[in-house]
């Protein structure tokens, strides 16, 4: 038979509960920071500039860099740094990540490539615009 000594104390039970709560919180935080697959950024890069890098000017002079970022998009991303830095692919990825996490957190967490691509292309409400359907599908095909 088990005696009193075999039962966990109140302190042990509280510590176990705290540990479970902490692990749950960490799991939730990890999920919130989930990201689309790396293939999403490669596909976006190919669709936007054919995979070229540098200070590529597009959209009649309104977009810059390998991911074709507009000034307003850069500002909306809230990433520190001068707009000219979007010519750098790594910086552009940070800008796109911040923008999409701001305007499409659920799609970001789910890795919803189509929705993310459509918002990248059409702005915060881009996922509901018929004009972005083909763009989203193209990025999704290339991301597979």
Task: State each model region's role.
Residues 21-31:
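Sec-dependent N-terminal signal peptides
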């Amino acid at each position: 038979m088990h005696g009193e000594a075999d039962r966990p104390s109140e302190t042990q039970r509280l510590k176990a509960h705290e540990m479970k709560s902490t692990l749950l919180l960490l799991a939730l935080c990890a999920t919130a920071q989930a990201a689309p697959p790396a293939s999403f950024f490669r596909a976006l890069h190919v669709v936007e500039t054919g995979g070229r890098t540098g200070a590529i000017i597009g959209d009649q002079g309104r977009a810059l860099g390998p991911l074709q970022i507009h000034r307003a998009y850069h500002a909306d991303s809230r990433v520190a740094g001068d707009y000219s830095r979007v010519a750098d692919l790594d910086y552009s990825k940070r800008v796109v990540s911040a923008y999409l996490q701001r305007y499409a957190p659920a799609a970001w967490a789910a890795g919803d490539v189509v929705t993310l691509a459509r918002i990248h292309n059409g702005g915060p409400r881009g996922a509901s615009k018929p004009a972005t359907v083909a763009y989203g599908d193209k990025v999704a095909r290339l991301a597979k």
